[in-house]
UniProtKB/Swiss-Prot annotation:
Protein name: Envelope glycoprotein B
Species, as recorded: Human cytomegalovirus (strain Merlin) (HHV-5)
Subunit relationships: Homotrimer; disulfide-linked. Binds to heparan sulfate proteoglycans. Interacts with gH/gL heterodimer.
Source organism phylogeny: Viruses, Duplodnaviria, Heunggongvirae, Peploviricota, Herviviricetes
Entry membrane topology: Single-pass type I membrane protein
Intravirion side: 773-907
Topology feature Virion surface, residues: 25-751
Length: 907
């Protein structure tokens, strides 16, 4: 009982002492504590917004309780503790666990240098040849006769061209020889059809004579044409008849022909294709192809041909071997040459003075930085004596020697003989290895000192069993694969070197890190092993090995960190790490400990040290840190504001340098265009040049042709010879009628013709009016119109036998006029009808008419007669009316014609 009382007294005293110390501490550091408390809550609240859920829960609990409230089951108040952070590692106790798994650190780590792929690299000079895709070009001569038949129909003023037919025929061989020796052609052509000989003459002359060749006006750069006639001839036939004429033109065309390897045929610019090798000479049929009719093929050695077909008496040239091929429309001739002398399968492409050859398992890689390309080839060399290399062998060796003399003669020596390789793309590489003179001297010195050396490098020979012949594969047109290979090889070498450095640095870093971990584990094995395994682990040394166990987890929300690190019982002593209180899971008993690294709780609070003033200590807890100044909590610090120790090992990796790829053009556009035997451009130019020769005289051609004439001609032609003759007759008659109608219509359409028709119409109207008025006067005054001489100039009637002037007498009465009209003599008229004269008989009437006719003839003769003395007309002598000229001349003076003396006597 006494012991219990004693214990209670001791506890009460301890509480009084603690409360007194707390009051004195709060009174001496009231301002600082208050500021620290406010800063702590502010920082904790700010950090809780970006922290984990557990932190927010702890902060809320701290805020919900009062500052002076006592923590459950402790003598501490909530103002004496701060919140916690469990972001990375949870709070745990690792010192209580017993190790069950044993581990140790490796000590004998050996880092070996990573070696790249074993490659045999050689330096040298490279000359590259490509396949020659340009077709073999040579000259050919084409002999032709052009027969042009034209049919026309002639109208009166127009000629209709009914049609034209052009036929190309081949001259006979005897005429070909005459053309080649004299530049002349005959003006006729004969053909046998079904046993009948048909002959055509130029201009229908029916005379066979020679015509001189002359240059055509239409030629181009690749073809030259010689003709005998430049203008097409046609003659107009008779009117309303058909006419068909013949125009014969001899034509010799010297044009270009192309043949592509393997030279089985060739094609000309005129569009002709000959299935014969241009190198076939009659004896090399196994090497040269022949696919034409052998009966029409001729070869003449030492054949003479004029040098210029367009010049008379031109000099003759002798050709070694000339071939002739007869066809239905032409004769083609060319000179036979030796294939080896005029063709070559290879042509120079590029040269690289700095080339690296790397040896792979089954191939060689020829890399050129200048060409930004890598070419692959088999290890088997091409036989230097291959016949395909004859045309380029000397040229390639000379180029290699020239490059060596220019760039390497002073510092390098040739290493080995010239070797030839064929790449996968069909290219041919001439390779000359080189090596520095200093290295060559060292090799020679080593060979002299080591007599037992059996693995000396020997020169490669092309005469060995590994030599092959050049294949007939075609060269590729695109070298993208070579540039891709160069890129891959460059990247491969760079990446391999980088990986080797990375692997070596990685091994060294692992070895160093392991040694550091081993030494640090002696201080805090749990922290080191937790960092290695990235999870909380309890570890302790068990001799020279480590024992591993899992840590004991605690209630995360019960952990509280004390603000004060001073030891109350021992003035001048301070805790080396902050004191924490916590509860184990499923327990309400409050435990004391100290905050370790990575939120590890160290059991007990015996870790103290002498207080050092001033003092600054920072303890990491998750993503934040507790800052204690003079062993009192001041604030929470974000870890990102504290710099870290840079312990990274530098890795020596250089960035890739820029590489500008060259645009490699294996074959130019000209070579690609020349590789085809058919050049469309030249063919069209040749066609247009010949088309311009076919021209017509437009003033002699009327288009369109009347459809009825064309239909009638077709109809009658289908009836045979008789129908054709009838058609010609009908066409002549119908053509005449049509010509007249067409002429009238054309005349009416002409402005001059229309004006003439208008004038004719006006003249017809005037004539009609004059005839009408004359007939009307004739009806009203028949005597005055029929016998104009009975009327005097003053309008009175003239009567013969009367001497008395009646102009002054009064006119007779009506009765007298009627009576006197029937009287024959003077005397008073009779008023009785019985006294009238007897009727005239027919004979008397007839005699009267005859007398009237004689009188009329005499009077008209007198009017039309002329006086031989003075030249005046008879009408003027007899006192007729003045003529029109006299009246116009004297119209203002009142001119009147006076009577002659004869007239006065008669009166």
């Amino acid at each position: 009982m006494e012991s219990r009382i004693w214990c209670l007294v001791v506890c009460v005293n301890l509480c009084i002492v603690c409360l007194g110390a707390a009051v004195s501490s709060s009174s001496t550091r009231g301002t600082s504590a208050t500021h620290s408390h406010h800063s702590s809550h502010t920082t904790s609240a700010a950090h809780s917004r970006s922290g984990s859920v557990s932190q927010r829960v702890t902060s809320s609990q701290t805020v919900s309780h009062g500052v002076n409230e006592t923590i459950y089951n402790t003598t501490l108040k909530y103002g004496d503790v701060v919140g916690v952070n469990t972001t990375k590692y949870p709070y745990r106790v690792c010192s209580m666990a017993q190790g069950t798994d044993l581990i140790r650190f490796e000590r004998n780590i050996v880092c070996t240098s990573m070696k790249p792929i074993n490659e045999d690299l050689d330096e040298g000079i490279m000359v590259v040849y490509k396949r020659n895709i340009v077709a073999h070009t040579f000259k050919v001569r084409v002999y032709q006769k052009v027969l042009t038949f034209r049919r026309s129909y002639a109208y009166i003023h127009t000629t209709y061209l009914l049609g034209s037919n052009t036929e190309y025929v081949a001259p006979p061989m005897w005429e070909i020889h005459h053309i080649n020796s004299h530049s002349q052609c005959y003006s006729s052509y004969s053909r046998v059809i079904a046993g009948t000989v048909f002959v055509a003459y130029h201009r229908d002359s029916y005379e066979n004579k020679t015509m001189q060749l002359m240059p055509d006006d239409y030629s181009n750069t690749h073809s030259t044409r010689y003709v005998t006639v430049k203008d097409q001839w046609h003659s107009r036939g008779s009117t309303w008849l058909y006419r068909e004429t013949c125009n014969l033109n001899c034509m010799v065309t010297i044009t270009t022909a192309r043949s592509k390897y393997p030279y089985h045929f060739f094609a000309t610019s005129t569009g002709d294709v000959v299935d014969i090798s241009p190198f076939y000479n009659g004896t090399n049929r196994n090497a040269s192809y022949f696919g034409e009719n052998a009966d029409k093929f001729f070869i003449f050695p030492n054949y003479t041909i004029v040098s210029d077909f367009g010049r008379p008496n031109s000099a003759l040239e002798t050709h070694r071997l000339v071939a002739f091929l007869e066809r239905a429309d032409s004769v083609i001739s060319w000179d036979i040459q030796d294939e080896k002398n005029v063709t070559c399968q290879l042509t120079f492409w590029e040269a690289s003075e700095r080339t690296i050859r790397s040896e792979a398992e089954d191939s060689y890689h020829f890399s050129s930085a200048k060409m930004t390309a890598t070419f692959l080839s088999k290890k088997q060399e091409v036989n230097m004596s291959d016949s395909a290399l004859d045309c380029v062998r000397d040229e390639a060796i000379n180029k290699l020697q020239q490059i060596f003399n220019t760039s390497y003669n002073q510092t390098y020596e040739k290493y080995g003989n010239v070797s030839v390789f064929e790449t996968t793309g069909g290219l041919v590489v001439f390779w000359q290895g080189i090596k520095q003179k200093s290295l060559v001297e060292l090799e020679r010195l080593a060979n002299r000192s080591s007599l037992n050396l059996t693995h000396n490098r020997t020169k490669r020979s092309t005469d060995g069993n590994n030599a092959t012949h050049l294949s007939n594969m075609e060269s590729v047109h695109n070298l993208v694969y070579a540039q891709l290979q160069f890129t891959y090889d460059t990247l491969r070498g760079y990446i391999n070197r980088a990986l080797a450095q990375i692997a070596e640095a990685w091994c060294v870093d692992q070895r160093r890190t392991l040694e550091v971990f081993k030494e640090l584990s002696k201080i805090n094995p749990s922290a080191i092993l937790s960092a290695i395994y990235n999870k909380p682990i309890a570890a302790r040394f068990m001799g020279d090995v480590l024992g591993l166990a899992s840590c004991v987890t605690i209630n995360q929300t019960s952990v509280k960190v004390l603000r004060d690190m001073n030891v109350k019982e021992s003035p001048g002593r301070c805790y080396s790490r902050p004191v924490v209180i916590f509860n184990f899971a499923n327990s309400s008993y409050v435990q004391y400990g100290q905050l370790g690294e990575d939120n590890e709780i160290l059991l007990g609070n015996h870790r103290t040290e002498e207080c050092q003033l001033p003092s600054l200590k920072i303890f990491i807890a998750g993503n934040s840190a507790y800052e204690y100044v003079d062993y009192l909590f001041k604030r929470m610090i974000d870890l990102s504001s504290i710099s870290t120790v840079d312990s990274m090992i530098a890795l020596d990796i250089d960035p890739l340098e820029n590489t500008d790829f060259r645009v490699l053009e294996l074959y130019s556009q000209k070579e690609l265009r020349s590789s085809n035997v058919f050049d469309l451009e030249e063919i069209m130019r040749e066609f247009n040049s010949y088309k311009q020769r076919v021209k017509y005289v437009e003033d002699k051609v009327v288009d369109p042709l009347p459809p009825y004439l064309k239909g009638l001609d077709d109809l009658m032609s289908g009836l045979g010879a008789a129908g054709k003759a009838v058609g010609v007759a009908i066409g002549a008659v119908g053509g005449a009628v049509a010509s007249v109608v067409e002429g009238v219509a054309t005349f009416l359409k002409n402005p001059f013709g229309a004006f003439t028709i208008i004038l004719v119409a006006i003249a017809v109207v005037i004539i009609t009016y004059l005839i009408y008025t004359r007939q009307r006067r004739l009806c009203t005054q028949p005597l005055q119109n029929l016998f104009p001489y009975l009327v005097s100039a003053d309008g009175t009637t003239v009567t013969s036998g009367s001497t008395k002037d009646t102009s002054l007498q009064a006119p007779p009465s009506y009765e007298e006029s009627v009576y006197n009209s029937g009287r024959k003599g003077p005397g008073p008229p009779s008023s009785d009808a019985s006294t009238a004269a007897p009727p005239y008989t027919n004979e008397q009437a007839y005699q009267m008419l005859l007398a009237l006719a004689r009188l009329d003839a005499e009077q008209r003769a007198q009017q039309n007669g002329t006086d031989s003395l003075d030249g005046r007309t008879g009408t003027q002598d007899k006192g007729q009316k003045p003529n029109l000229l006299d009246r116009l001349r004297h119209r203002k003076n009142g001119y009147r014609h006076l009577k002659d003396s004869d007239e006065e006597e008669n009166v």
